[in-house]
Amino acid sequence: GRRIMGETPEQQGLDTMWDNRIWVHVLYRITTAFHVLHEGLGPKLELTSNHGWGEHCRKEALAHAGLVDRYLSDGRDWLLGGEEPTFSDITLATAIAFSKYPVNATPLDERFEHLAAFWQRWLGRPAFLAAYADRNSGVPELDDRA
């Protein structure tokens, strides 16, 4: 079967690199901004409120999302350029989905052309939509579809 992290050692290295970059510099930054900008999440989720740090994290996430957007601008559908997504693509889709929570106010697909096309490719995949079949994700675009 297909290898989710790439077929060759080079592809596997690139997939790991992109996965780490997206997790650390995009998804984790959006998650951190969410936690430090919002109160009332409870002691297990709520970090110390710090609006300055939250805005810094939001800006950093946007800057790195711009880098990923430029990388996708060569016309590739997926980060490694293959016909199917790899693990790093799943991490990027997760980052875009989390950015779309209304309280985050950082919808990456609305800010970056190639991330928008990337997101639309995920929305066209039945297996991706099946993961949101309960329509309780908090992302209106996934929950309110016909």
Residue locations for each model-derived region?
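Surface-exposed helix-capping loop/turn segments at secondary-structure junctions
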Residues: 70-82, 126-132
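Acidic/histidine-enriched, glycine/proline-rich intrinsically disordered or flexible terminal extensions
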Residues: 135-146
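Short helix-capping/linker segments at secondary-structure and domain boundaries
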Residues: 38-43, 99-107
